[in-house]
Amino acid sequence: SLGHPQAIHSSPPDSPAMTDIEDLACLAAKFDRSNTRAPTSLQEVVSSGNCMGCGICESIAGPEYIQMKVLPPKQRMRPVFLKALEAEVHGKALAACPGAQVSSLPGWTPTTGMEAFVGKVMSIQRGYASDPETRFKAAAAGGLTTLGMHLIESKQVDFVVHVKACALYSDESTQGSKLSFTSAEVFDGRGSRYGPVAPLKSLEDALSLKRPFAVVAKPCDINAVRNYAKVDPRVDELCKCLMTVSCGTYADNVCVDKFLKQHEVEHSEVEEFRWRGHGCPGDTPYVKAKDGRVAADDYVDFWFYNGKEAGPLTYQWRCKMCSDFLGYQSDVVVMDCWPNGLPERRNAITEERKHEWDGWVLIIARTQRGQDVVDSAKAAGMLTLGPAEGREVLQTQPHQARRAASNFIRRYSHASRPLMALDEGAALRVAKWAMDEDFVDEVMATGPAAPVVADAAEQLREILPKGEAWAEAMLKMPERHIAYHLDNFKGTLKRLERGDATETVSTSAD
């Protein structure tokens, strides 16, 4: 079907077709909550805060119908709807949209919250790009850049679909897909792009070439490609590897404007702009003006203080609700290994510890296809890898575990507002994150405790549905867990009520 894969809300507990998170919660209880629904149009994906700007809708519909643009006031990448789509085309685009449906790799079922958090693993290794220049200049120890270069050099693919990371967002030529046919072109796109970009707006162009290719993009972009494969067989035929990062979110482009203003650099004066790289993590961001002036922030300051006086970093609502941040649908995911679980300021790193910051990553192969790619890159000497364990994901990226444990209750707080649906596998992992007491305890140990509320259980009882087995099971959790879930419910609801999930839909008339 080309129509939108709606979440199912009223299947019996033993139904294999269950797809909504509430159905797959503790004890797989039936939870008929029909006022929870996914967006039913591309426009509603945008208006309800579920869009993340991947560009697949423009790719499917064509630029005469939809164009991805950077739009004020936050300077986010969003579709501009120019003409009405035919029903079949709209259905196809909506079926692919990661703002409408989050999917999973089939045939794998986690048994614990930790397994669900790490995701499907064929192998997990720790290492870096063997080439010193790639390791230094690319982000995250050059892992993804190396894999992309290797796929072309080994002739496993003819080209790679990715983006040019080191670019200022006002450069329109870098706002969409970059198709690289040589390893040098892949290297030219190196570095993280911590801002809105539409890596899939040229996916149809890639498919039309009828040549094997790979995709390097964010987890939500990979989600879109997997969704699209269900309605277009060319994707599985031609796309030989889907590679991604561990994604914490990306900043609105208005944060770049704040950074430039703070350092008294105009857009027109920029000669070079880098989000990351030249160290791990390196300056974040870095700008060189045409007159030779250089400005840079420390990674910690930009992400957590957005340049201190510049104000808080802002990002889109879709990222706050993400349940795919570790690339659970990818063939290969590459993620930073932060020593002690946090990036540190450069001036806090002693000479004795400098080797820890040369750039290390965890590389997880999730599929046999991904395993073959990683193995061949290692055999070719392009990656230097050693053994690692799944628990290192939580130890080096605890912030992602905190996102996981709170995802279920944040989804529940949405009430009647449209929210991207979860397929059965995605729903199961979200339920495992919330309901596995051992996992929640490990997660809570990585951050500050939730505020103590004397009547937390009573408050949560008023919020949850009556008579549902999963809700009763949640209320029987330890008090510290109840306080944790209640705190996340209230925080999400507060943000919803102030309009964080509401956006304006742009048309040709705007």
PLM features per residue range, with description:
Residues 15-42, 83-86, 105-108, 118-121, ...:
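Non-ligating segments of multi-cofactor redox enzymes
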Residues 19-40, 56-81, 190-192, 283-304:
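Short, charged low-complexity linear segments at domain edges
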Residues 28-32, 52, 56-80, 90-111, ...:
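Iron-sulfur cluster-binding cysteine motifs and their immediate structural context
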Residues 43-64, 79-100, 139-142, 220, ...:
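Cysteine-centered iron-sulfur cluster-binding motifs in ferredoxin-type domains/subunits
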Residues 76-81, 88-92, 96-144:
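Entry/capping segment at the start of metal-dependent catalytic domains
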Residues 157, 268-508:
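Long, compositionally biased charged/polar accessory segments in the mid-to-C-terminal portions
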Residues 231-244:
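A short alpha->loop->secondary-structure connector
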